[in-house]
């Protein structure tokens, strides 16, 4: 796999690459579900979940704002036309994403540590430390390669980073759809779901990278064949 110091060319807009549209649709659907199912308590001061969050409720504000910005804006970074035609916007959104990750990860770890007083196991705090560290490491690698203008590696690491970040939605969707998020919380079930999502997140990111690379190779082969055909006609 070669690296590049220029703007990454987009795969041809063939039918196969339109796989990105259902992927983005699934992400949007997860966002909508989590906002409706899990986050409505934000506008309902009488929701009993506030009793659980009371010891660390003010830490939820920076954690939620930073995480919301990162998760909502990140899909725009993978939109080819935006990335290639509006590089300043791409860099701005990328900066917001990196800052968001560097806020949400340590704050989330602190919140989970405080949650031990509510019955969460220390092993869950350790899991959150691994999850947060994985997210930060992938993001910082992506930033490092962006600063070095090695955009292939930058894209690969940012895809891994976002795959880890998406576990926020995946965990809540799985718990909600299968009715596992009832109160009082079964911490063993929750931790199992969280570990499963986190353990597979980088793998999911690498699968996405492989799909992108295979589409890119196919696009280059088609372009090369077309050029050869045109040259032969001339």
Regions found by a protein language model. Give the residues of each.
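Alpha-helical membrane insertion/targeting regions
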Residues: 2-234
């Amino acid at each position: 796999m070669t690296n590049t110091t220029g703007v990454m060319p987009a795969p041809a807009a063939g039918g196969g690459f339109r796989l990105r549209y259902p992927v983005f649709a699934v992400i949007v659907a997860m966002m909508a579900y989590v906002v409706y199912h899990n986050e409505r308590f934000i506008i309902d001061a009488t929701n009993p979940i506030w009793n659980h969050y009371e010891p660390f409720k003010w830490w939820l504000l920076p954690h939620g704002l930073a995480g919301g910005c990162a998760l909502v804006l990140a899909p725009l970074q993978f939109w080819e036309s935006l990335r290639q035609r509006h590089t300043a916007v791409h860099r701005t959104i990328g900066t917001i994403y990196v800052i968001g990750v560097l806020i949400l990860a340590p704050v989330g770890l602190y919140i989970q540590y405080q949650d031990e007083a509510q019955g969460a196991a220390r092993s869950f705090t350790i899991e959150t430390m691994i999850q947060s560290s994985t997210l930060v490491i992938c993001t910082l690698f992506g930033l490092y390669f962006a600063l070095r203008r090695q955009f292939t590696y930058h894209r690969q690491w940012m895809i891994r980073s976002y795959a880890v970040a998406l576990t926020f939605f995946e965990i809540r969707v799985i718990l909600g759809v299968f009715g596992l998020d009832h109160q009082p919380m079964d911490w063993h079930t929750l931790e199992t779901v969280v570990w499963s999502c986190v353990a597979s997140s980088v793998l999911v990111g690498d699968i996405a990278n492989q799909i992108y690379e295979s589409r890119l190779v196919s696009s280059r082969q088609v372009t090369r064949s077309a050029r050869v055909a045109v040259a032969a006609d001339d």
